[in-house]
Amino acid sequence: MTYSKNVFIPVTNICRNQCGYCGFRREPGQPGARLMKPEEVISVLENGVRAGCTEALFTFGERAEEVPGYGEMLEEIGYSSTLEYLVFLCETAIDIGILPHTNAGIMTRSELEALKPLNASMGLMLESTAVLAAHKDCPGKIPERRLETIREAGKLKIPYTTGLLIGIGESRDDRIESLEAIAALHREYGHIQEVIIQNFAPKPGTEMENFPEPAVEEMMDSVELAARILPGDVAVQVAPNLIDPKSLIAKGVTDLGGISPLTIDWINPEAEWPDVKNLQKKLGDIPLKERLPVYPPYVKKGWYSERIGSLIKRLSDNSGYRKQPGTENAEDSEK
């Protein structure tokens, strides 16, 4: 059972989509609207390295430039585009000693090309191939557009994370179709390292605040479908702060995602991360093994750029997993 140790950095919560279930999004000028300043991000990155984290998860609202007022927020910190700022943040993370994983919504091929050398992996939740009421005001949630981004990442050989959001109005057949679409892309390009099966959690003040959460049985079935439909080299992940993973492991869960010792889950702020030691106790004789934000097979295949290669080598062991923290420099000096 694998996991990574990360810092969760919500660079901006300004977003062009208005999902019926989202409590993260804000409009410029609203209370809680943010674009993190460089010094704020750098502080989190430095604390993350000190705490032994290997992953900087950069999350963004999608295409914030389309939202009036966001451009001025960018200008205030000295940048002309989100991409320009993100490139700076990724470069800074690498220099500080932590691997970027960017999740910024749908992207063009040229945007992916700009970010590929600076990211250990990238991600975009497919959520569903179904057209849903929850996504009615969301130009970025058109399934074909999301699949196109995932496809372009495959063509560029970017180790990739995607997933399904369970319980937002989709049917079981929709879940099967979504998993089959992901499986087909992986068979073609070999780049999907993990698929998250994430349970919907209602947020107060949203359109779907009274929508029922999916039952545990529904999650067990969804995990079972994922394990059956996805190729065997794709990890099936659940979020241990949103659901007790114990009952899902027998159904095919192999990974517990990024767990942070420092930062909250900004998308689900009410759901605390479990402590890794407590999680290990709960899992009993199933050993927890730490990985990097890029999975071991992709480390071994060399699916990374020269820019991050030395950092990946420093942080990974011979099997491509996380090297025992504290031994990185000692082992480097022995080589």
Swiss-Prot record:
Catalytic activity: 5-amino-5-(4-hydroxybenzyl)-6-(D-ribitylimino)-5,6-dihydrouracil + S-adenosyl-L-methionine = 7,8-didemethyl-8-hydroxy-5-deazariboflavin + 5'-deoxyadenosine + L-methionine + NH4(+) + H(+)
Pathway noted in the entry: Cofactor biosynthesis; coenzyme F0 biosynthesis
Subunit structure, as described in the record: Consists of two subunits, CofG and CofH.
Residues the entry annotates as binding [4Fe-4S] cluster: 15, 19, 22
NCBIfam families in UniProt: F420_cofG (TIGR03550), PRK06245.1 (NF004884)
CDD domains documented for this protein: Radical_SAM
Free-text function comment from the UniProt entry: Catalyzes the radical-mediated synthesis of 7,8-didemethyl-8-hydroxy-5-deazariboflavin from 5-amino-5-(4-hydroxybenzyl)-6-(D-ribitylimino)-5,6-dihydrouracil.
Pfam families: Radical_SAM
Name recorded for this polypeptide: 7,8-didemethyl-8-hydroxy-5-deazariboflavin synthase
Cofactor: how and how many bound: Binds 1 [4Fe-4S] cluster. The cluster is coordinated with 3 cysteines and an exchangeable S-adenosyl-L-methionine.
Similarity annotation: Belongs to the radical SAM superfamily. CofG family.
Co-factor(s): [4Fe-4S] cluster
